Amino acid sequence: MTSIFQRALGPDFGQLHPQLQRRFGFSAADGVACVGRGTMDRVWHGRIFTRPFLALGARRHILITGSGRDIPFTIENYAYRDGFGRETVTFARTFWFDTAQHWDATMIYSAERSAIVDYLGTHQHLAVDLHMTADEQGGLLIRSGEQRFSECGIGLAVPRLITAVAEVRESYDDDLDQFRIEVVVTNRVFGPLFGYRGTFTATYSELTQVPAWVRPVKETARA
């Protein structure tokens, strides 16, 4: 079965580095778990007035509030079919500050939107379109687009003025034999909100059951 990222990228998926093709190329039918472990060279957040915004998101694992250097990091990717039968991939990120902080997401591919839809947090309140391209070096570039807030079956587009725009680049360093990741999240009013960069290695194992804690508490059908 084709992965959601193969559907999103189409023929350009073949331009990715082979290690990225492996990491983003499995589906629920493959029964594979991918767990990345590494270190973020730097995790940062914006000016002090952004912290209440970050703290609000952190309550539902949508954002993180910690900062520092050489922060241990894990990312857990499991492919499964959700309660609506949609091919879904988890992105469960843990940053090990003095205490663990989580930034979690589940992703699907929406043919209607011609994009990956990234459901952020524990209750899928926030749905974000992700637009992906492969760069000339075989890296994966991701930029967030339209955002929608959903609660009690009602979906509302988030005004661009208050949206957080994420830019992500993931690549593979053949010299280090590791993945590189850099994420920057900004707001057009408040400026940079937070970001991180670092490296990690990925291990692949047979998946018998998706851990309950990486699945959202609540699923939403609205893409």
Predicted segments, located by residue:
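Exposed beta-sheet edge/beta-hairpin loop segments within beta-rich domains
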Residues: 186-192
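HotDog/MaoC-like acyl-thioester-processing domains
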Residues: 215-222
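Soluble ligand-binding/transfer domains with enclosed cavities or grooves
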Residues: 2-185, 196, 208, 212-215
